[in-house]
């Protein structure tokens, strides 16, 4: 089963210092997903970070679906910035120097995240998706309401919102939620 992991285990991943580049990449991608509201790998890899303070994207999974596009808009938290700086390419996208197709890259990332988790003594089965599951779980445990968490991960349900500035209002809630979840990592 793809399990969420504990706050302690997220800290273990964050604080790991692997020598191998592929494991550093695994650590950084996992943490970026956690820091950026459980963003999916495809959306993360397609995003142009050049001169951006916010991350705005339409979930790849929701594009062209009947339910409408799921737009996510979040302020990039400070924790994410050094990781982005480390891997950003001239084009503004993240580049880890691999010439894989996206599918093969995704498989490789999943394998390396599992290897990293094992190496640092995490017993749970950890995959890239675990960052997303854990982000939601930890937020819920901190008392953040589900609607805000669903917005963060791009799963807002009702698309016909009466509130004109829905995204602006939700971004504020999302930013506060992410701050609370990330501050919890500092304890």
Segments and roles (model prediction):
Residues 1-41, 45:
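Basic, Lys/Arg- and aromatic-enriched nucleic-acid-binding interface segment
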Residues 4, 10, 77-123:
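Active-site/catalytic core of tyrosine-dependent DNA strand-transfer enzymes
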Residues 10, 23-27, 106, 110, ...:
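Short, leucine-enriched amphipathic alpha-helices that occur as contiguous helical runs
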Residues 15-21, 110-155:
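Short, basic (Lys/Arg/His-rich) helix/loop patches that form interaction surfaces
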Residues 18-20, 60-75, 97-105, 122-127, ...:
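Short, contiguous acidic/charged loop-to-helix segments that flank catalytic cores in large enzymes
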Residues 36, 45-83:
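Conserved tyrosine-mediated DNA breakage-rejoining catalytic core shared by Y-recombinases
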Residues 39-40, 72, 132:
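Short, cationic motifs built from Arg/Lys/His that form the positively charged side of catalytic pockets
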Residues 59-64, 153-184:
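Catalytic-site neighborhood detector that most strongly recognizes the C-terminal catalytic loop/helix
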């Amino acid at each position: 089963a793809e399990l969420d992991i504990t706050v302690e285990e997220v800290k273990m991943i964050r604080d790991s210092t692997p020598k191998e580049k592929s494991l550093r990449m695994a650590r950084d991608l996992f943490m970026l997903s956690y820091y950026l509201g459980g963003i999916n790998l495809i959306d993360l890899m397609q995003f142009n970070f050049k001169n951006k303070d916010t991350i705005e994207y339409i979930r790849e999974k929701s594009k062209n679906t009947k339910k409408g596009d799921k737009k996510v808009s979040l302020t990039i938290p400070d924790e994410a910035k050094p990781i982005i700086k480390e891997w950003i390419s001239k084009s503004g996208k993240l580049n880890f120097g691999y010439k894989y197709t996206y599918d093969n890259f995704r498989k490789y990332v999943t394998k390396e995240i599992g290897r990293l988790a094992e190496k640092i003594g995490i017993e749970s089965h950890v995959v890239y998706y675990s960052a997303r599951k854990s982000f939601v779980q930890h937020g819920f445990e901190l008392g953040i309401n589900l609607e805000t968490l669903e917005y963060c991960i791009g799963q807002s349900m009702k698309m016909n919102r009466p509130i004109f500035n829905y995204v602006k209002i939700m971004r504020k809630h999302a930013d506060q939620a992410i701050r609370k979840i990330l501050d919890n990592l500092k304890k």
